[in-house]
A protein has these predicted regions:
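Active-site signature of cysteine proteases
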Residues: 4-10, 25, 221-369
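Active-site nucleophile-adjacent alpha helix/oxyanion-hole segment immediately C-terminal to the catalytic cysteine
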Residues: 8-18, 22-42, 51, 58-199, ...
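Active-site cradle of extracellular carbohydrate-active enzymes
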Residues: 193-232
Length: 369
């Protein structure tokens, strides 16, 4: 039997949806909207029965408090008209119910999408609080770090490069991109940061990513890069002791393995050797040495592969220079350990989950410089 809270949420959704003109999705029918409502009920019932409704965010409020806030409070002006509230509500519920659906579309927001997926999986109450804050009233929210995340995204209409990225993910990721570079506004439509009138491109460099990651999670993360390893190697050539320096080539796979054994994930930048430009008719047709952020999930020593979540959610192999296997349509991929280790250029991990002396099932393969 459904609880009073669940029925209240569905009731609020019903009242909103009856006034949704035009339909939520162009061309949808009443039957399709009823199917959407039933899927929403299933998702809400699952969240309630699993106890997720009562999970608390960093302010002590529950996940259901954020859902009710989103359903009842005044929205930030650009989202106030229907189908804004209806669409945002069910997209948030589905993102929490099934975080695997979170992706970057064809935008250069792989880093922000990785953080969004991580937060929705690991701290759904905090994720819901942040989304509710971004879309209600002033369009801003205080993160765990005490810093403000601000929503400047003012359009819910889909863009061709959104692909399967939903409206909530677009709002969240655009706000993250804006925060990561406080002195360079981000434009979601053209997918770029602006320095004055100059579009300097999309994506996040490692310092910007680290700033965003620590602000969102409230945790301390350690970042290592190929450059750190090269400097350590150079110092070692002058007789400086560098054995205690964490080396991404030597230790990277071990870090992923130890983190996974303690139910933690690692953020990794892979430098993809070459790839067809994913944007139709865009120039150049082939891109080379492109950085791409993924979440490393675990190491399978038996099959000698690293499992990872690709925020592109590819439906086919989309880059060259390494073997990769797709396990589903939601970004679960795997890559041979040797290839993954060779492509790693940056890694952000929780330092308390890695110890050099820890017993390893198998050693990581050193990078060949």
């Amino acid at each position: 039997m459904s609880s009073a809270t669940l029925e209240k949420l569905l009731g609020l959704f019903d009242r909103r949806e009856q006034r949704t003109l035009p339909p939520i999705i162009r061309g949808d029918t009443r039957a399709e909207r009823m199917e959407l409502r039933e899927n929403l009920r299933i998702a809400l019932e699952s969240l309630e029965s699993s106890g997720m409704f009562e999970q608390r965010d960093s302010t002590g409020k529950t996940l259901v408090d954020s859902l009710l806030r989103l359903a009842e409070e005044t929205l930030w002006d650009p989202f106030a008209r229907e189908p804004g509230r209806t669409r945002i509500f069910f997209e948030l519920v589905f993102n929490v119910f099934d975080p695997k659906r979170i992706n970057q579309g064809l935008k250069g927001t792989c880093a922000a999408a990785c953080i969004e997926g991580y937060l929705a999986e690991r701290d759904p109450a905090e994720y819901s609080r942040i989304v509710a804050g971004l879309v209600t009233r002033e369009g801003l929210v205080t993160m765990k770090s005490g810093q403000m995340l601000v929503c400047n995204e003012d359009v819910l209409a889909p863009h061709e490069r959104e692909q399967r990225r939903n409206a909530v993910s677009r709002i969240f990721q655009a706000a993250c991109m804006e925060f990561a570079y406080p002195n360079m506004p981000y434009d979601n439509v053209v997918d770029g940061h602006f320095h004055g009138d100059d579009n300097v491109g999309s994506g996040l460099e490692i310092n910007a990513f680290e700033r965003l990651l620590q602000a969102i999670t409230g945790q301390t993360w350690k970042t290592i890069t190929v450059m750190h390893s090269r400097l350590a190697k150079q110092f070692a050539s002058f007789g400086v002791e560098t054995r205690d320096v964490v080396h991404i080539g030597r230790d990277g796979v071990a870090i992923i393995d130890q983190a996974a054994r303690q139910n933690e994930q690692v953020f990794v930048t892979l430098e993809l050797p070459s790839m067809p430009n994913p944007i139709p008719h865009a120039e150049p047709p082939v891109l080379y040495n492109m950085p791409h952020k993924v979440r490393a999930l675990r190491v399978d020593w038996t099959n000698r592969v690293v499992h990872y979540d690709d925020p592109m959610d590819p439906d086919r192999r989309w880059f060259d220079g390494a073997e990769m296997t797709l396990h589903d349509s939601f970004g679960h991929c795997s890559m041979p350990i040797d290839d993954f280790s060779r492509l790693m250029t940056e890694m952000s991990y929780r330092p308390e989950f890695f110890t050099r002396e820890a017993d390893q099932q198998a050693p990581a393969q050193p990078r060949t410089e």
